[in-house]
Regions:
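Tandem CBS (Cystathionine beta-synthase) repeat/Bateman regulatory domains
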Residues: 1-131
Length: 131
């Protein structure tokens, strides 16, 4: 099985022009540890609560920045035709709960770890998809 067959194509993301207030609103939802920032179909980066704290501590004027300005552009990604085993390896290497899926610079969605593990376990045991 490959990444394309398991990805979530409509995840909750932030537009590049989102305000810090919009970023904070998303990051304060339960179970949200970070947010991906996209500009159209291009993945710009990722923002964590620590990103906002650092910006405030550095004295940045949050009234004049966007999500794209705050985003860390170093986001581990995987291509849609890679194996799910490779995706899990990348997730383990970077301690990720989800992995961004990108094809030729175009953001396609995310691959969440928990359902991926359940799906792979079911496949290994010859069971139907548990979802």
């Amino acid at each position: 099985m490959i990444v394309r067959e398991a990805l979530v194509s409509d995840p909750r993301v932030l537009p590049a022009d989102a305000t810090p207030q919009q970023v904070a609103e998303l990051l304060t939802h339960p179970h949200v540890e970070s947010a991906l920032v996209v500009d159209g179909e291009r993945l710009v980066g990722s923002i964590t609560p620590e990103t906002l704290v650092s910006a405030i501590a550095e004295g940045r004027d949050l009234g004049s920045v966007t999500a794209a300005d705050l985003a860390d552009g170093e986001v581990p990604t995987i291509g849609p035709d890679e194996s799910l085993e490779e995706a899990l390896r990348v997730m383990a290497e970077h301690d990720l709960e989800r992995l961004a899926v990108v094809d030729g610079g175009r953001f396609l969605g995310i691959l969440p770890r928990e359902p991926l593990i359940r799906r792979m376990a079911a496949d290994e045991l010859g069971e139907t998809d548990p979802d």
